């Protein structure tokens, strides 16, 4: 947007000191926290998104009797989790795609990590862009974390 200027942005307001210049292409960020998916929040969110697929609402539509959690809800949870590690990100400029690789059910705990794919400088003062790959998962982390990263001494790693 015209007039965008983050030159004097105060990182103490977000509680995280890292800005665009601190991230490196290829870096993987563990977003640390997890969220256990609840039936009620899934049902409400799925209705708000106007997804009417019966597998999300009617337990009799699956042989195991479980409602399948709507992938859009999992994506939203992952995006929320990504604020831990990307707290100074100010806007999403685009979503380039998504895949639902595995099922999610009520009671599953979702975690997330991101990989920095690319960086771009912009003409706006104090503003840069990161191209990220955000991955939601349940279970153990799917990559080895650098637990001794001097840039992030206060991060807890799962």
Language model: regions and residue ranges:
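A generic structural signal for short, non-catalytic loop/turn and secondary-structure boundary residues
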Residues: 24, 88, 154-156
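Intrinsically disordered, low-complexity boundary segments flanking structured domains
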Residues: 17-18, 23, 80, 143-151
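HotDog/MaoC-like acyl-thioester-processing domains
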Residues: 1-8, 106, 113-158
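Generic structural hydrophobic/aromatic packing signal, biased to beta-strands
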Residues: 20, 31-34, 45, 78, ...
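Short, intrinsically disordered/low-complexity patches at protein termini
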Residues: 53-55, 93, 98-99, 129, ...
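Solvent-exposed loop and beta-edge segments used for protein-protein assembly and interaction
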Residues: 25-26, 69, 106, 126
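Catalytic strand-loop segment that frames the active site of acyl-thioester-processing enzymes
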Residues: 1-68
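Hydrophobic beta-strand-centered segment that forms part of the acyl-chain substrate-binding groove
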Residues: 63, 69, 74-119
């Amino acid at each position: 947007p015209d007039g965008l200027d983050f030159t004097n942005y105060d990182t103490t307001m977000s509680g995280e000191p890292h800005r665009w210049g601190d991230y490196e292409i290829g870096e993987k960020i563990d977003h640390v926290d997890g969220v256990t998916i609840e039936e009620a929040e899934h049902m409400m969110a799925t209705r708000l998104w106007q997804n009417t697929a019966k597998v999300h609402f009617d337990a009799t539509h699956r042989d195991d009797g479980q409602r399948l959690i709507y992938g859009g809800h999992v994506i939203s949870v992952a995006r929320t989790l990504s604020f831990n590690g990307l707290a100074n990100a100010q806007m999403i400029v685009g979503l380039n795609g998504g895949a639902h690789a595995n099922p999610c059910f009520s009671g599953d705990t979702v975690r997330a990590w991101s990989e920095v794919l690319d960086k771009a400088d912009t003409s706006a003062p104090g503003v840069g862009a990161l191209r990220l790959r955000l991955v939601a998962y349940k279970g153990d982390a799917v990559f080895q974390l650098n637990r001794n990263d001097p840039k992030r001494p206060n991060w807890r790693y799962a």
